[in-house]
């Protein structure tokens, strides 16, 4: 079953509840940069997120350099954002809890 694309109001409602996630200019994806104390913390975060992504069968676009992980989420099958993107974003936020320095 193809995921249903969210409308602008639903996207805004989700984003209002989430810290640090930004809607792309074209409205088709959300992104966030996670910064950790060390590379090991970043890698642990990515590993935990990979397991969550597999369970959801929804995979992020991400880029890692040392302690920084840039994440972009969208649902290509829906050509935009779906509930899956926000579910995975929430799982990523949970995985990052307690791992990121307070000042970043």
From Swiss-Prot:
InterPro entries membership: PCD_sf (IPR036428), Pterin_deHydtase (IPR001533)
Family matches, as Pfam families: Pterin_4a (PF01329)
Alphabetical list of Gene3D superfamilies matching this protein: Transcriptional coactivator/pterin dehydratase
Keyword Lyase set for record: yes
Protein EC: 4.2.1.96
Catalytic activity: (4aS,6R)-4a-hydroxy-L-erythro-5,6,7,8-tetrahydrobiopterin = (6R)-L-erythro-6,7-dihydrobiopterin + H2O
Keywords, ordered alphabetically: Lyase
GO biological process: tetrahydrobiopterin biosynthetic process
GO molecular function: 4-alpha-hydroxytetrahydrobiopterin dehydratase activity
Keyword DNA-binding: no
Protein family (similarity comment): Belongs to the pterin-4-alpha-carbinolamine dehydratase family.
Listed name of the protein: Putative pterin-4-alpha-carbinolamine dehydratase
Species for this entry: Rhizobium meliloti (strain 1021)
Protein encoded by which gene: pcbD
